[in-house]
Swiss-Prot record:
SUPFAM superfamilies: HprK N-terminal domain-like, PEP carboxykinase-like. GO terms for biological process: regulation of carbohydrate metabolic process. The lineage of its organism: Bacteria, Bacillati, Bacillota, Bacilli, Bacillales. The active site is at residues 138, 159, 177, 243. Catalyzes the ATP- as well as the pyrophosphate-dependent phosphorylation of a specific serine residue in HPr, a phosphocarrier protein of the phosphoenolpyruvate-dependent sugar phosphotransferase system (PTS). HprK/P also catalyzes the pyrophosphate-producing, inorganic phosphate-dependent dephosphorylation (phosphorolysis) of seryl-phosphorylated HPr (P-Ser-HPr). It comes from Bacillus velezensis (strain DSM 23117 / BGSC 10A6 / LMG 26770 / FZB42) (Bacillus amyloliquefaciens subsp. plantarum). Gene3D superfamilies: HprK N-terminal domain-like, P-loop containing nucleotide triphosphate hydrolases. Homohexamer. InterPro entries: HPr(Ser)_kin/Pase, Hpr_kin/Pase_C, Hpr_kin/Pase_Hpr_N, P-loop_NTPase, Ser_kin/Pase_Hpr-like_N_sf. Pfam families: Hpr_kinase_C, Hpr_kinase_N. Its cofactor is Mg(2+). Both phosphorylation and phosphorolysis are carried out by the same active site and suggest a common mechanism for both reactions. This is HPr kinase/phosphorylase. Keywords: ATP-binding, Carbohydrate metabolism, Kinase, Magnesium, Metal-binding, Multifunctional enzyme, Nucleotide-binding, Serine/threonine-protein kinase, Transferase. It catalyses: [HPr protein]-L-serine + ATP = [HPr protein]-O-phospho-L-serine + ADP + H(+); [HPr protein]-O-phospho-L-serine + phosphate + H(+) = [HPr protein]-L-serine + diphosphate.
Amino acid sequence: MAKVRTKDVMEQFHLELISGEEGINRPITMSDLSRPGIEIAGYFTYYPRERVQLLGKTELSFFDQLPEEDKKQRMKSLCTDVTPAIILSRDMPIPPELVEASEQNGVPVLRSPLKTTRLSSRLTNFLESRLAPTTAIHGVLVDIYGVGVLITGKSGVGKSETALELVKRGHRLVADDCVEIRQEDQDTLVGNAPDLIEHLLEIRGLGIINVMTLFGAGAVRSNKRITIVMDLELWEQGKQYDRLGLEEEKMKIIDTEITKLTIPVRPGRNLAVIIEVAAMNFRLKRMGLNAAEQFTNKLADVIEDGEQDE
């Protein structure tokens, strides 16, 4: 899991630092935010102190009505040694009790001009993206007709050469050799290339080429949601391969299962065209058009008609 610090959030959203500067390197370990309204009312039994605290007009207007002694005590309880930051929305005035408590405990107090709900959604999306579970897979990721296709297989089977042919046919390369994958949601996997090898493609006998330089900016993209895996393997004599496409194989990446197709490789097979058509067929299946099922139904009808004629 990637590390996010308060400083990263401050720079990403151009937040104004009010106090507690010594704590800007505190780690943020979860994407959930806290609106500490009930805590300001005095109930701290289940206070999620490890979350980023977000104060809006509702919380601060209630806080203004508290007695002076209660104000100091509530802010001291709000600013703990593990609280990453306290953020105020709408450029609202900062209570002096909050500034004092934040300086004592080193909790950064930040301010944003955004409305509370808008700031909350943006913060949550940013943290979920940065804190998502990640992994790396040896393969090639290509955007084919809007379908994110992860091409896997043993080294030397022809993944990069296939990707090069797909790029020449107008599709877009995302990553070659190493694909960094993060799970942004329960069923959403997004892949990208490591910074070091972004836009690069390695072809045996040719070396490393820069796809963006050779084919233009339209031939690459920085990231893509992965929707199907195509595993290339050398053709094994006697092994039974799927010839109808009725059964779907699944592959688990992190906690998400996605469709996997095994494509046998042998001389004379145009892998780029096969993968291209497989991506198009996958889109058709998602639209409810399954050629294999239609063929099976027609075959069953023909057999049934033949039995009736007898």
